[in-house]
Amino acid sequence: MSASVFVVVASCLAALAHGYANPGSCLGACNVHDPALIRRESDGKYFRFSTGNKISYASSSSIEGPWTVLGSVLPSGSSIDLPGNDDLWAPDVSLVNGVYHVYYSVSTFGSQSSAIGLATSSTMDLNSWTDHGSTGIQSSSSKPYNAIDGNLFKDGGTYYMNFGSFWHDIYQAPMNSAATSVASSSYNIAYNPSGTHAVEGAFMYKYGNYYYLFFSAGICCGYDTSRPASGEEYKIKVCRSTSATGNFVDANGVACTNGGGTVVLESHGNVYGPGGQGVFTDPSLGPILYYHYVDTTIGYADSQKLFGWNKIDFSSGWPVV
């Protein structure tokens, strides 16, 4: 057996021992942080958005690639008057009334001076994006939440924005019918009362009769300079509910507002710290969990994080990858 074949086999065995499949194939531009994925209706092309470079984005003919970087959504930064408006984070993408919406975060690390902004385009072509500034979801030190990591979800005719990071974790706010601005006050839907409340990056997905609230838990970043204690690194968890607006519980029945959360994907084999996730319905593969992760054979720096994806099996009523 050649050395390269041995490495591949060993990696696969390690992943299977932990019960997780290895990430699916990624070709081309695969370095990402906080990916967001959508497929253009007009031609089926895939678009992937990520933190950095004022929301970098790439396109491909399939989820596997090859991915080609197009450029920045907002090359001049955001019009939101807050520190960090030239270093935009955590994009989320949706098609709303025939227009593509990219929601983004303006903040600085560890600060509650934050806001969720919006850029729109009818095509997603380079230089076609219009910045609309803040959605009205903002935070300061007087708030119980941090207004970053937005995720738009439509239930029936109503849009909701799920958001939050640390502090009191994940909140939800109803949006107006155009999904451009907040319509009423927010409320808490997930909270870990212990430790540093390390919960963020909510993403909601409906499958069957359940609404699944995916989120990232643990320490996200800076692994190359300070590695967290084993098990404290990023991982992907989930709770579910029969309503989009609350009462989410994990597989053991623990409320998501009281530290609940069933692990969907965590470190295994050469995969370390998966998180920043979303769920995408692929026309050929079905439900896909996508995320960023560290390949420990390559490096632990944030700039070295890779795009990962796995098919989701919902047959048990809970997502399994």
UniProtKB/Swiss-Prot annotation:
Principal subcellular localization: secreted
UniProt keyword Hydrolase present: yes
Subcellular localization(s) per the UniProt record: Secreted
List of catalytic residues: D34 (proton acceptor), E200 (proton donor)
N-terminal signal peptide: 1-19
Molecular function GO labels: arabinan endo-1,5-alpha-L-arabinosidase activity
Reactions the enzyme catalyzes: Endohydrolysis of (1->5)-alpha-arabinofuranosidic linkages in (1->5)-arabinans
EC number: 3.2.1.99
GO cellular component: extracellular region
Keyword Nuclease: no
PANTHER family hit by this protein: ARABINAN ENDO-1,5-ALPHA-L-ARABINOSIDASE, ARABINAN ENDO-1,5-ALPHA-L-ARABINOSIDASE A-RELATED
Role: Endo-1,5-alpha-L-arabinanase involved in degradation of pectin. Its preferred substrate is linear 1,5-alpha-L-arabinan.
Protein name: Probable arabinan endo-1,5-alpha-L-arabinosidase A
Encoding gene, per UniProt annotation: abnA
